[in-house]
Amino acid sequence: LSYVDAIHSRDEDRIYVVERGDDGKRHYNEFPANYVFYYDDPKGKQRSIYGNPVSRFSSRKRTEFEKERRVYSGKQLYESDVNVVFRALSENYLNVPAPKLHTCFFDIEVDFDPDKGFSPTDDPFNPVTAISCYLDWLDQCITMVIAPKHMSPETAAEIVAEFENTILFTSEKEMFDTFFALIEDADVLTGWNSEGYDIPYMVNRVTRVMSKDDTRRFCLLGQLPKPRTYERFGKEEQTYDLIGRIHMDYLQLYKKYNYESRHSYKLDAIGEMEVGENKTQYEGTLDQLYNKDFKKFIEYNRQDTMLLVKIHNKLKFLELANQLAHENTVLLPTVMGSVAMIEMAILNEAHERGMVVPDKKRKIDNDDEAQQAAGAFVATPKKGMHEWVGAVDINSLYPSVIRALNMAGETIIAQVRQTLTDKYMKDKALKLGAAKKRAKEGDEVTGAILWEGLFGALEYSAIMNQERGTILTVDYEDGRSVEMSAAEIWKMVFDSHKPWMLSANGTIFSYEKEGVVPGLLTRWYSERKETQKKAKEAYGTDMYEYYDKRQLVRKILLNSAYGALLNEHCRFYDKRIGQSVTLSGRQIVKHMMSQINQTVAGDYTHEGEAIVYGDTDSCYFTAFPSLKEQIKNGELDWNKELCIGLYDSIADEANNSFPAFMEKAFHAPRKNGEIIKAGRELIGDRSIFITKKRYAINIFDKEGKRKDKEGALGDIKAMGLDLKRADTPKYVQEFLMDVLEMVLQRGNSREEVIEKVKEFKRVLVAQESWTKGSPKS
């Protein structure tokens, strides 16, 4: 048995759990609430992550717990603020496999009032006219409809009879009763934008047509749907969270777990992109369809539901979310954020090591904290056409940096006070502010732009240059502050046999014992490698999906960890760590680019002739200009196979350089330096770079797989070029792609491309104006 959902009854001090068993049946369970905290105690038998002894207080009564917690007010407490439901899940379900959920995919249609128009979700004056539910445990789509008022019962019955599992109703109440009967054995309700429309409309409509008490039938455990406000298009909207039976909006799941952004998130656009299917097309309005073509209206409602089912069957995002929730003992809706899930993952890891974690810090308003942390390094590309561009990228850059420098709150030794950096930032903010249009005196610019051009705190640069005349302050974690020259700090870290490392943020970490977070990331990384290997071995068998899902879970956890740690609402938030990650990451990427340029052109610089572009964890380069003379003279027989071999060896050389660089730049031991790994990702024969985040490459080899076989000319990777914008008419999208193929794949001349553009312009001018702006035309 494993949990589906759980609630905490504060009055009864109980945790009520809905479970789904291996037998496919629903079960109910309950546990006494366990209220726990730890406090510093020299005689304590347990340890915090910082290594200090602590003692435990626990109670089954909330009032007793809160009374005791007040006694320790103002003192450092541990885990007193852990969610009591998550604690129960951790104590009772850790390492229990996720259950196979019963999911109902659904979609509703609503009537239109000719006088009052469409009804909003908070005032649902129009009746629901159709509900389609696909129940995955029965593999059936069931549709409930109410006929238009003008239609005779006989005609309506004839139309409905043409569809399987479709039921005609004369009253909304009967239809809602049937809907509740159908979802009785569902664990999850999901729809497309159901958070914004279907759920709030249905809950409010049931309240109006039946009663508020009837809305309990959406939930289990006798609970009412819980109202929640959220922001949408800059406006506050209200929706409802279901209890016992969970609601998950598939649109939100898609946005979270599909890593490529889409110009349109409408079901029609996503259906076409993911499964090659569209919504049912019709002329006029949905109200006209309902009243004039009832058959197509039913078809439309059923197709909306089945399109969602097909998208899910391909992507399996619900199963992914379920797996994430259970691996980290949180509730299913919790995975829609990353902070609470990552916190529980770290807490569970600490407990496995016999340690406890501190309470969240109370937020203190501080100008220094308000200064935005440095972001990723993104270079300005060399604009124009480039031939034979290769890309090398670093595997999981940020998680790897955290592991390599053993970054954790409990491993921080000291921080070099950022007096120079703060002054530089202040001066730059004022200078950029003064340059703004209509600038007022004292205007400042804030944000990541202030870090442009920097690869570390100024203090870090002074230390690495061993400047004797630059006096800096080292703030130790034990409260001491010591003034030293930058050269003395370098000697203290790099030349005194201490197990210390210095990040590019000027934070000193110890590698004496592994931190909880780096250890957890190391485990996830090795588990991912292992499950990737098993997935590869199981390809073509029933077990492939099982292993592939598990490696994807690890990938998501690794990527989520850094974002959560940099979120000020996270228990483990520390700006020093967040900035150490990005600035050290910048140093590593800068080195990789410099190393690649040295291998190709003989000069150690990240802005050398071989470098085309750099972004976050990737370097785009070309060796072709350096070899042009040799190719021209016939000394080198240039072809794709030779290019692949050469670029692979360039990537290997960059990869092999990391351990020595990590020791020189951060004083990282060799085994830590070996954590940073890069690999050749792609090679393209032709590419065009426009500006940051906007480029296109015709790829002929991606990670060792050829893309130009069996008549294919390659695979175009287009970033930020608006080729698939939802508001771009189809014929314009096709034209833009055709031009890109002419330039990158077919080798057309400049004159031919210009003529193609002129021809398109002539056709466009001659077209009727109403067709020009239609995305469907």
Q: Residue spans of the language-model regions?
A:
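Short active-site loop/helix that positions an aromatic residue
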Residues: 198-208, 395-409
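DnaQ-like (DEDDh/DEDDy) 3′-5′ exonuclease domain used for proofreading
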Residues: 1-185, 219, 302-303, 307-329, ...
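Glycine- and acidic
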Residues: 159-166, 183-188, 290-296, 327, ...
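Active-site palm subdomain of RNA-directed nucleic acid polymerases
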Residues: 279, 589-616, 628
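Common nucleic-acid-contacting/processivity interface regions adjacent to the catalytic cores
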Residues: 287-406, 414-416, 421-434, 543-595, ...
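C-terminal polymerase-core module
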Residues: 620-777
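Proline-aspartate-enriched helix->loop->beta-strand connector
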Residues: 179-202
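Active-site-proximal helix-loop-helix substrate-binding element of RNase H-like nuclease domains
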Residues: 141-145, 150-166, 170, 189, ...
